[in-house]
């Protein structure tokens, strides 16, 4: 099974059509990767589906970079 970081970057690649080598952990979805608000909602939904978790609106607002999404998923997986 791929690790969390690879899986998240694959989702970003698929949703935002950005080359994977351009997706850095400190990249902001909006400022660096060009996502708009609809894109970020779709990213959150894709994360929920991929990792079989629920992300509240409050949590989703805090997930605004690649690294924050990795950290969040790692914490959620530890609680399972």
Swiss-Prot record:
Coiled-coil ranges (or none): none
How does it get modified post-translation? 4'-phosphopantetheine is transferred from CoA to a specific serine of apo-ACP by AcpS. This modification is essential for activity because fatty acids are bound in thioester linkage to the sulfhydryl of the prosthetic group.
**Family matches, as InterPro entries:** ACP, ACP-like_sf, PP-bd_ACP, Ppantetheine_attach_site
Question: Keywords in UniProt for this one?
Answer: Cytoplasm, Fatty acid biosynthesis, Fatty acid metabolism, Lipid biosynthesis, Lipid metabolism, Phosphopantetheine, Phosphoprotein
What biological-process GO terms show up in the record? lipid A biosynthetic process
Q: Which GO terms describe its cellular component?
A: cytosol; membrane
Which Pfam families does the UniProt entry name for this protein? Answer: PP-binding
Modified positions (O-(pantetheine 4'-phosphoryl)serine) in chain numbering:
37
List, in alphabetical order, the Gene Ontology terms for molecular function in this entry: acyl binding; acyl carrier activity
**Annotated pathway, please?**
Lipid metabolism; fatty acid biosynthesis
Taxonomically, which superkingdom?
Answer: Bacteria
User: Where is this chain's protein located in or outside the cell?
Assistant: Cytoplasm
Carrier domain: which residues? 2-77
What PANTHER family would the database entry show? ACYL CARRIER PROTEIN (PTHR20863), CARRIER DOMAIN-CONTAINING PROTEIN (PTHR20863:SF76)
Stated role: Carrier of the growing fatty acid chain in fatty acid biosynthesis.
Q: Which family does it belong to?
A: Belongs to the acyl carrier protein (ACP) family.
Name recorded for this polypeptide: Acyl carrier protein
Q: Which organism is it from?
A: Buchnera aphidicola subsp. Acyrthosiphon pisum (strain APS)
